[in-house]
């Protein structure tokens, strides 16, 4: 719901503006009988404030914070009509509840306004004139004076949303300026100090998952067998146990995964080269294979730099039933490319809501099951709606298991030589893990706790102890570009081995002692089994 602070600011603004503006016309004799347009204006002002409060409240409930930060702006404005339609499909119950309450309040306001109109019509004219002007002047003066306070001025709904949209457009403008800046600075690439230190042939596949929570994978101990294919490959994989995303939303997370930007310097993506640029400078042929529609913002700038691009999703973006398995031929073609050094980025739709659109019907394995997970959710007081979404989410995880495992097998079967495949998700997902909610979550650890796993030929033959040490290193993905550059064997002024999770020089202590943060607070790994929902409050 809307915060007390926001509610107080909106109430003050509405309390001073509405009576002041509407009261002018009540007090003036000419408007003794209120005209219809004045009623429309009065109701419009009231509706604007209440709709603004309702929208902010919904966004706070959905994202866990008010719609100021970059991640919410991207989620609101960086979308297309079909993705918007999918959002409504996924959240129609909550939206229906909010809409019903808003309609009820609106009807009550309309009735109250009519009652006030009849009451005013019966009051003596002189009473209106004498008592009206002074109070109206005070209210209007207070309303205007409040706008000298920048914080209060920005809470005016007539300004709040236009300002937010202008902020978003400015970010897009910065991205366009970045393209121009990069073009101008081509001659300055020597300052990057790029050096390739690897073998003659090297292939790195980077699979980027979407909205994937590791606590829903049997590979990480989940009570449902959602990842049987990855489970079978377990001995050949390095499965990192304590990795979190830097952000709970796609765009802001990817900005920090692909560039030197991190939680300390979030704007570094504006001025420093991304992974693809550094790889190409080192002589790599780059591929971008995606089941997400081409992006016209920052991510579009990155993907368009790839030497070869394949976007199989030509329809409704995240609202398209185009399954990630359809990316496999594109990956196999890239693996067969004769280039000696290849970086192949594969961007999945993963488990992004709407969950039941992420898998074919043959993977609807957990629909209506009555198992220990269902009992845990029920005991924790999760609604039947959330329990159903958890089943659909687990189906999506099961299909994601097939996709990722198949890509690992394809990479394993590729031409001999150095080869690695890293799978990491952009962010997690809350699906009844800690509360009765399904979707992105800024405040809950479930929005950040992601899987990360690696297959690499260079690690074969290492001891179980070495593997266990690696798997238990704490990490956050705003430093993931260092690990990618390590796999690529590319050194530069932007690479730090202390942030490369595979490096012998990796400094675990930094990540254990406050470097990792979620929602502005230090992240503390949970000491309870994180794949079980919390108990009911008071139980």
Regions found by a protein language model. Give the residues of each.
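Acyl/amide activation-and-transfer machinery of modular secondary-metabolite enzymes
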Residues: 446-453
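Active-site-proximal alpha/beta segments of enzymes that process anionic O-linked groups
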Residues: 138-206, 211-375, 449, 477, ...
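Membrane-interface soluble catalytic domains
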Residues: 7, 11, 30-33, 113-118, ...
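Short, P/G- and charge-enriched loop/turn segments at secondary-structure junctions
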Residues: 192-195, 436-443
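A long, amphipathic alpha-helix that forms part
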Residues: 329-332, 370-421, 454, 479
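Transmembrane and membrane-interface helices of multi-pass
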Residues: 1-160
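Residue-level marker for buried hydrophobic side chains located in beta-strands
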Residues: 207, 421-423
């Amino acid at each position: 719901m809307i915060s007390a602070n926001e509610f107080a600011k909106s109430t003050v603004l509405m309390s001073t503006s509405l009576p002041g503006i509407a009261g002018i016309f009540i007090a003036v004799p000419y408007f003794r009988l209120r005209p219809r347009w004045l009623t429309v204006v009065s109701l419009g002002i009231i509706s604007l404030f209440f709709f603004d409060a309702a929208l902010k409240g919904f966004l706070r409930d959905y994202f866990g914070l008010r719609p100021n930060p970059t991640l919410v702006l991207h989620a609101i404005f960086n979308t297309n009509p079909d993705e918007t339609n999918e959002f409504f499909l996924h959240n129609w119950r909550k939206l229906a509840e909010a809409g019903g309450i808003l309609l009820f309040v609106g009807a009550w306001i309309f009735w109250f306004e009519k009652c006030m109109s009849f009451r005013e019509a019966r009051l003596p004219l002189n009473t209106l004139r004498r008592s009206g002007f002074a109070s109206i002047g005070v209210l209007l003066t207070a309303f205007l004076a409040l706008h000298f306070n920048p914080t209060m001025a920005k809470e005016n709904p007539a300004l709040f949303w236009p300002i937010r949209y202008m902020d978003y457009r400015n970010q897009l403008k910065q991205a366009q300026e970045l393209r121009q800046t990069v073009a101008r600075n081509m001659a300055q690439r020597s300052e990057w100090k790029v050096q390739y230190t690897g073998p003659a042939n090297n292939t790195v596949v980077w699979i980027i998952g979407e909205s994937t929570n590791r606590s829903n994978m049997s590979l990480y101990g989940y009570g449902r067998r959602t990842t049987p294919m990855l489970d079978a490959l377990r001995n050949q994989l390095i499965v990192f146990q304590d990795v979190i995303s830097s952000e709970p939303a796609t765009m802001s997370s990817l900005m920090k995964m692909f560039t030197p930007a991190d939680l300390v310097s979030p704007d570094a993506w504006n001025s420093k080269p991304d992974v693809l640029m550094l790889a190409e400078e080192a002589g790599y042929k780059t591929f971008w294979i995606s089941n997400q529609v081409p992006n016209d913002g920052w991510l579009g700038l990155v993907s368009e730099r790839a030497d070869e691009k394949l976007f199989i999703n030509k329809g409704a973006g995240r609202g398209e039933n185009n399954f990630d398995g359809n990316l496999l031929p594109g990956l196999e073609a890239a693996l067969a490319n004769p280039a000696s050094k290849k970086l192949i980025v594969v961007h999945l739709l993963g488990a992004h809501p709407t969950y039941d659109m992420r898998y074919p019907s043959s993977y609807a394995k957990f629909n209506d099951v009555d198992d220990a997970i269902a009992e845990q959710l029920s005991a924790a007081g999760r609604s039947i709606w959330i329990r159903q979404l958890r089943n659909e989410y687990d189906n999506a995880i099961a299909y994601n298991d097939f996709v990722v495992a198949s890509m690992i097998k394809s990479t394993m079967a590729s031409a001999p030589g150095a080869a690695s495949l890293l799978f990491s998700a952009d962010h997690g997902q809350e699906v009844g893990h800690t509360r009765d909610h399904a979707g992105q979550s800024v405040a809950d650890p479930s929005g950040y706790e992601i899987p990360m796993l690696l297959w690499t030929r260079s690690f074969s033959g290492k001891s179980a102890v070495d593997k266990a040490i690696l798997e238990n290193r704490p990490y956050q993905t705003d430093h993931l570009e260092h690990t990618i550059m390590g796999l690529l064997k590319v050194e530069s002024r932007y690479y730090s081995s202390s942030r490369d999770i595979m490096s012998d020089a990796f400094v675990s202590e930094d990540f254990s002692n406050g470097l990792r943060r979620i929602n502005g607070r230090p992240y503390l790994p949970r000491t309870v089994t994180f794949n079980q929902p919390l108990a009911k409050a008071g139980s």
